[in-house]
Amino acid sequence: MTDPSRLVTPERRGDDLGDAALRPQNLSEFVGQQQARANLQVFIDAARKRKEALDHVLFVGPPGLGKTTLAQIVARELGVGFRATSGPVIAKAGDLAALLTNLEERDVLFIDEIHRLSPSVEEVLYPAMEDFQLDLIIGEGPAARSVKIDLSKFTLVGATTRAGLLTNPLRDRFGIPIRLNFYTIEELESIVTRGARVLGTPITADGANEIARRARGTPRIAGRLLRRVRDFASAADAEAIDRAIADHALGALEVDSAGLDAMDRRYLTTIALNYGGGPVGVETMAAALSEPRDAIEDIIEPYLIQCGYLQRTPRGRLLTDHAFRHLGLAAPSRDPAQFGLFGDTGDQE
């Protein structure tokens, strides 16, 4: 199974609880996602001026890019209450009803992993989002009756890493869909520099750059790497985190110059050496690495594709020449027909 303790996993880990102090508190402090942030500011200002609930918001993007942080900022900027839960936690319609009936006017309800809601819960959510009403069935059999409960006008903020798993009726009820993208190195430098300041740790510009370059475009990983590099700097009695300290620390932690760790290199090396660089189907890779398909598609591959090391083609996964150069291997000569014209068309074996 994918090791949840991977330093560069974008998924939330137990030690990320310390990130709360590093999180921006409002949109002006939030770095990156410029267009999404600007649009969100307009929608928030308009709702606040009209004294109305903000339209329902859907954040889509890989883990660790700030979906939860933005949801909290939305509530803070609106000056309303904030309740948070996740799709798997809402097991039955009654759980959702309890959450919704306790919301005050214009409050924000945040549902992480909203694509994992059960169909029965989704059915209850539709009228709640559209008409601010709950349609519940009370009792069973011939004695069962339908009850309508009026709700306060609230804002649902959903977050998902798998937009394709959302049902169309649910997706269509979000008036403000926002896609979050990986961050640039410059944006991550700003995040690392701010984080070091919050932690009271001096850092040089080249030290922040070294951490940012290896943070895989993800603020959550940048904060995690910063905390670990800070440990190395403290142990060495360094006055500040500079490039040399950061390079030594991240090398010791097996995070290479491109932000790849042992799992990433194992994935790339398996395709390169065992399958001639590909194409190879994702199910074959799942068996070869003893990893579930979801972990490969959601955790391992996105950053490798973003970096240009991997292509999803109609015939399967294919390493690029860039990947071979990074591994220090000679790229094989390949028929151009192996490359798909339009990327991924699903799993191919």
UniProtKB/Swiss-Prot annotation:
Per the annotation, which location comes first and is thus the protein's main one?
cytoplasm
Q: Where is this region: Large ATPase domain (RuvB-L)?
A: 1-183
Q: InterPro entries given for it?
A: AAA+_ATPase, AAA_lid_4, DNA_helicase_Holl-junc_RuvB, P-loop_NTPase, RuvB-like_N, RuvB_C, WH-like_DNA-bd_sf, WH_DNA-bd_sf
**Which GO terms label this protein's molecular function in UniProt?**
ATP binding; ATP hydrolysis activity; four-way junction DNA binding; four-way junction helicase activity
Q: Under what name is this protein listed?
A: Holliday junction branch migration complex subunit RuvB
Annotated Mg(2+) binding sites? 68
**How does this chain assemble?**
Homohexamer. Forms an RuvA(8)-RuvB(12)-Holliday junction (HJ) complex. HJ DNA is sandwiched between 2 RuvA tetramers; dsDNA enters through RuvA and exits via RuvB. An RuvB hexamer assembles on each DNA strand where it exits the tetramer. Each RuvB hexamer is contacted by two RuvA subunits (via domain III) on 2 adjacent RuvB subunits; this complex drives branch migration. In the full resolvosome a probable DNA-RuvA(4)-RuvB(12)-RuvC(2) complex forms which resolves the HJ.
Q: Where is this region: Small ATPAse domain (RuvB-S)?
A: 184-254
Which of this chain's residues are annotated to bind ATP?
Answer: 22-23, 64, 67-69, 130-132, 173, 183, 220
What is the recorded function of this protein according to its Swiss-Prot or TrEMBL entry?
The RuvA-RuvB-RuvC complex processes Holliday junction (HJ) DNA during genetic recombination and DNA repair, while the RuvA-RuvB complex plays an important role in the rescue of blocked DNA replication forks via replication fork reversal (RFR). RuvA specifically binds to HJ cruciform DNA, conferring on it an open structure. The RuvB hexamer acts as an ATP-dependent pump, pulling dsDNA into and through the RuvAB complex. RuvB forms 2 homohexamers on either side of HJ DNA bound by 1 or 2 RuvA tetramers; 4 subunits per hexamer contact DNA at a time.
Pfam family, any one: RuvB_C
Gene source species? Rhodopseudomonas palustris (strain ATCC BAA-98 / CGA009)
Q: Which UniProt keywords apply?
A: ATP-binding, Cytoplasm, DNA damage, DNA recombination, DNA repair, DNA-binding, Hydrolase, Nucleotide-binding
Compartment(s) of residence? Cytoplasm
- Organism lineage string: Bacteria, Pseudomonadati, Pseudomonadota, Alphaproteobacteria, Hyphomicrobiales
Q: Domain of life here?
A: Bacteria
What this protein catalyses is: ATP + H2O = ADP + phosphate + H(+)
The UniProt record gives the binding positions of DNA as 293, 312, 317
The record's note on its domains: Has 3 domains, the large (RuvB-L) and small ATPase (RuvB-S) domains and the C-terminal head (RuvB-H) domain. The head domain binds DNA, while the ATPase domains jointly bind ATP, ADP or are empty depending on the state of the subunit in the translocation cycle. During a single DNA translocation step the structure of each domain remains the same, but their relative positions change.
Q: Where is this region: Head domain (RuvB-H)?
A: 257-349
Enzyme Commission number: 3.6.4.-
Q: Mind telling me which GO cellular component terms the entry cites?
A: cytoplasm; Holliday junction resolvase complex
Which GO annotations describe the biological process of this protein?
A: DNA recombination; DNA repair
Family, as annotated: Belongs to the RuvB family.
